[in-house]
Amino acid sequence: MKKSLTSLDLNLLLCLQLLMQERSVTKAAKRMNVTPSAVSKSLAKLRAWFDDPLFVNTPLGLVPTPLMVSMEQSLADWMQMGNQLLDKPHHQTPRGLKFELAAESPLMMIMFNSLSQQIYQRYPQATIKVRNWDYDSLEAITRGEVDIGFTGRESHPRSRELLSLLPLAIDFEVLFSDLPWVWLREDHPALREAWDLDTFLRYPHISICWEQSDTWALDDVLQEMGRKRHIALSLPGFEQSLFMAAQPGHTLIATAPRYCQHYNQLHQLPLVARPLPFDAQQREKLMVPFTLLWHKRNSHNPKIVWLRQAINTLCRRLI
């Protein structure tokens, strides 16, 4: 028999979402500012309502049942719509409005000063939270923890980061496309040699750990050629790799998007750029579409629409 929503305490759905996010009764209780016992009692009520265990206890934490997994997206959508409904008054008087962004650095560092000024000019009492883009950022957008993401995707046909492979719930807009370049210290010995593939591969490389991987489309292209680069150092992001490439006493080289020239100028890094020594077809596989990403439920959210427009305008002016 179909159950009536009026007989369900809606606070239980918030508890259910937090349990799905945390996979722990204790952590969910901490986020709700209640005792673990209270969360356990709520979970018992939810199990009775859905006639399903919902979660199974394991040494690694709570593991959702197939029914719980099937409900995850609908639950996140429902909670997000509830938050938007409660935020309606803030569209007229935007006190306490929050902006949650996940962005690739140094891209955000180039534009953040201008973007934050625009946000505070329009919403003087807004708060802004920026996190680095990482392997969990798409899930954070889906869960409603991030309003909008700004990052590069890949173009190589074998890449896991193709725009065509984004989850169906994610909308996106490509703001610009960029080709990675090679960045070397001004006195790097490679600059005294003919710039070709052999020179490029002769020296140790700095790579970045992207989406929990130390390799990317560049390494796929090299593999197709029967070649491989020596990755001597892996770092969390482009800004760290550029900083290290600029330091004396080593022959490391970095590969980073061409837009990083703006970052280098801003921080006066003594770096010289060289194009990747590949043909046009190979370079096409390395093209990086820099993309805004948001959840479909936010496509008409006034705050998100305004933020997208602001970032779009800044990109055209700064990049």
UniProtKB/Swiss-Prot annotation:
Gene designation: yidZ
InterPro entries associated with the record: LysR-type_TF (IPR050389), LysR_subst-bd (IPR005119), Tscrpt_reg_HTH_LysR (IPR000847), Tscrpt_reg_YidZ (IPR023746), WH-like_DNA-bd_sf (IPR036388), WH_DNA-bd_sf (IPR036390), YidZ_PBP2 (IPR037402)
Similarity-based family: Belongs to the LysR transcriptional regulatory family.
Record key words, sorted: DNA-binding, Transcription, Transcription regulation
Residue ranges: DNA binding: 25-44
Limits of the HTH lysR-type domain: 8-65
GO molecular-function terms, A-Z: DNA binding; DNA-binding transcription factor activity
PROSITE patterns for the chain: HTH_LYSR (PS50931)
Cited PANTHER family: HTH-TYPE TRANSCRIPTIONAL REGULATOR LEUO-RELATED, HTH-TYPE TRANSCRIPTIONAL REGULATOR YIDZ
HAMAP family (UniProt xref): HTH_type_YidZ
Protein name per Swiss-Prot or TrEMBL: HTH-type transcriptional regulator YidZ
Job description of the protein: Involved in anaerobic NO protection.
